[in-house]
Design a protein with these regions (language model features):
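C-terminal functional modules
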Residues: 133, 137-140, 145-185
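Structured, solvent-exposed acidic/aromatic patches
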Residues: 1-140, 180-183
Length: 185
């Protein structure tokens, strides 16, 4: 990791690794076949945090909510169920994204947290969030990064069978552990 960082990594969205296909075939999976839905976990975090990127990334369900599907549930009627869950926004001309500046910056932050400086890790974490907001065309990154009150939402299954409590109490702002646990392997 240190060598890659020293040699230079993606730091701007203009350098994101994308491929513009003639036809994005994943659009068939999401839009035509209706075989996929967004995972419940990501939407519980994003709903709880009131994340502005959500509407840039996902389609709301048939009643205007953002709801993911839990892994392994029993769906007896695909046609009934799929309208209840959110879908990815992807069009036939959407480029394939292999790697982006936000992910590179998050990974750099993890490296710094483990082998470098917690303060540098904090700065990189915040920069990664800002890059993600910028890539999605969402506003409000600075307010998002300092909101220490919002937490992941519990999961309410729109079909009523698989609801669950929130998986975490974590908030968005960076907090450095005072006991050194943030740098342990």
């Amino acid at each position: 990791a240190a060598e890659a960082i020293a040699d230079g990594v993606i730091t701007e969205n203009a350098d994101n690794a994308k491929l513009q296909p003639e036809l994005n075939r994943t659009a068939l999976l999401w839009n035509s076949w209706q075989d996929h839905a967004i995972g419940a976990d990501i939407l519980c975090y994003m709903n709880g945090y009131k994340d502005p990127r959500m509407e840039k990334m996902f389609l709301a369900n048939d009643v205007g909510d953002y709801v993911g599907i839990r892994i392994g549930i029993d769906v007896t009627s695909k046609s009934q169920a799929m309208s209840k869950y959110s879908n990815m926004i992807v069009a036939s001309d959407t480029p394939y994204l292999w790697f982006n500046a936000a992910e590179a910056t998050f990974l750099h932050a993890e490296y710094e947290l483990r082998w470098g400086s917690a303060e540098t890790a904090k700065t990189l974490y915040e920069q990664a969030v800002r890059l993600s907001f910028e890539e999605r065309g969402a506003s409000g990154a600075d307010a998002y990064l300092v909101d220490a009150t919002k937490k992941p939402a519990p999961y309410t299954d729109p079909l009523g069978n698989y609801s669950a409590s929130a998986r975490s109490e974590i908030t968005v702002p960076w907090e450095t552990a005072t006991d050194g646990s943030d740098t342990e392997a």
